[in-house]
């Protein structure tokens, strides 16, 4: 019975990962093959950092759609096939840049793409789905404000708010799934609440400190949106 429940949960998780991949990959393709919007240029975000992040996310989603409850094992072909697929897509992606106004192929972008894929697969080699998802999400919400040289909240207030709320809510949910409670212990209580917010608050503090150290804008509105995301994540995990 327990195995059946676990199998059904894994199948449901795979469906969600396939749906996420079906939405993410086409969106990534479209955004990479249109002229760079003026607001993106104004934000002055590190291009190589963005390549690293989006390919790390793509690789995580690809693997999770194939084996949502297993780690990458390099003795089997799965990890190598995912890496080959990402490499092939990255080559096609860079090749098509010649046909887009204002864009050009760059070998350094390819290196950043492969670095993102390699890091994601490395994480998936060590960790299973929930902690791996938490790490990839943490990388995303940590790196974006550090990479942006302009205040994203001023340039794109709605999108930036959605990003922080959604990103920190997702991380909080994944974080709570990684917490282990003694058998029979109550899921909801002060100890559970403290453990649930400890990781997200540590991530928020690290992002704030790193952004300030790098001279990047990460102010009270950014932190408020992130705190809202943490609250949403805790409330969803609680129910």
For each predicted feature, which ranges?
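Bulky hydrophobic segments
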Residues: 2-92, 98-99, 118-239
